[in-house]
Curated annotation (Swiss-Prot):
GO CC entries: actin cortical patch; actin cytoskeleton; cellular bud neck; cellular bud tip; cortical cytoskeleton; F-actin capping protein complex; incipient cellular bud site; mating projection tip
Assembly: Component of the F-actin capping complex, composed of a heterodimer of an alpha and a beta subunit. Interacts with BSP1 (via C-terminus); leading to recruitment of the F-actin capping complex to actin cortical patches and the acomyosin contractile ring.
SUPFAM superfamilies the record matches: Subunits of heterodimeric actin filament capping protein Capz
Location of Phosphoserine modifications: 17
Role summary: F-actin-capping proteins bind in a Ca(2+)-independent manner to the fast growing ends of actin filaments (barbed end) thereby blocking the exchange of subunits at these ends. Unlike other capping proteins (such as gelsolin and severin), these proteins do not sever actin filaments.
Protein family membership: Belongs to the F-actin-capping protein alpha subunit family.
Keywords carried by this UniProt record: Acetylation, Actin capping, Actin-binding, Cytoplasm, Cytoskeleton, Phosphoprotein
Name recorded for this polypeptide: F-actin-capping protein subunit alpha
Acetylation is among the record's keywords: yes
Location(s), subcellular: Cytoplasm; Cytoplasm, Cytoskeleton, Actin patch; Cytoplasm, Cytoskeleton
Length: 268
């Protein structure tokens, strides 16, 4: 296999990793491909972390890394005024230094004000581990990036979940665009992966945080309805006789016991 093809395969495997299980995927890949492939795998993990806006521990704070706060090989946090390197496997900040945020149009105070309002909303609405960020969009002087990441890892009960919502708000046109994505992986006596998402486009937005709250509440309600439909209709349509016991499965009780729908919606 050529080196480019090998890198492509490694990137595909890393990008398909379930939430909260990247370290296990890394360990398995090292066993399969040997230590000689370590740098290729770590490069793929770096790309995964940036694309998925993974939170990194920096001086006891959770800081989201993304393409919006990447500066060379480092990442900056404009609210806490630091710039840092990242150990992408351990998800920890290194070589942390002071950072002075400057922007042609957006002041640090504007970011801090939006940051604080967003914090209030998230404390009320996200019961899991939640991280968030407000970053200027490079080369787009009137645009701000807003990122929310919530994780709930429960390996003792064989499931992990991840919520990510990312938005771009234009201060001049008052337009808000973005995407919400969720993923849940359940792997006790099987392998069930659930993914859902929604594209967002809103105009005439004055209160950004209030609009985000409404959007995400509606998405959560739609998610509840889709789980109900999955439980009451889709899974029941799959009912069949088993070859050994020739008994029927009560799909309503079975899928209900997995708690995927309720826990994903409630962030448990």
């Amino acid at each position: 296999m050529s080196s480019s093809k090998f890198e492509e395969v490694i990137n595909k495997i890393i990008n398909d990793s379930p939430p909260g299980e990247l370290r296990e995927v890394y360990d398995d890949l090292i066993k399969i491909t040997s230590e000689n492939s370590k740098n290729t795998i770590l490069d793929a993990i770096e790309n995964y972390n940036v694309q998925n806006c993974i939170p990194i521990e920096v001086n006891g704070n959770s800081v989201i890394i993304s393409k919006y706060n990447k500066e060379g090989a480092k990442f900056f946090d404009p609210v806490n005024s630091v710039i840092f390197s990242v150990n992408h496997l351990e998800r920890k900040g290194l070589d942390i230094e002071p950072y002075e945020f400057t922007h042609a149009k957006i002041e640090k105070g504007q970011l801090k004000e939006l940051h604080d309002k967003l914090h209030e909303y998230l404390l009320q609405s996200f019961p899991g581990d939640v991280s968030f960020a407000v970053y200027p969009v490079p080369e787009e002087i009137s645009k701000i990036s807003i990122i929310i990441v919530s994780t709930k890892y429960n390996p003792n009960n064989f499931w992990n979940g991840h919520w990510r919502s990312s938005y771009i708000y234009d201060l001049e046109t008052r337009e808000l665009s973005g995407q919400i994505s969720t993923q849940v992986h359940y792997y006790e006596d099987g392998n069930v992966s659930f993914q859902s998402g929604k594209d967002i486009n809103q105009s005439n937005v004055d209160d950004v945080v209030c609009t985000i709250r409404d959007i995400e509440t509606n998405f959560e309600n739609d998610l509840d309805l889709s789980f109900f439909d999955l439980n009451e209709k889709q899974f029941k349509a799959l009912r069949r006789r088993l070859p050994v016991t020739r008994s029927k499965i009560n799909w309503g009780s079975a899928i209900g016991s997995y708690r995927l729908g309720k826990n994903a919606a409630e962030g448990k």
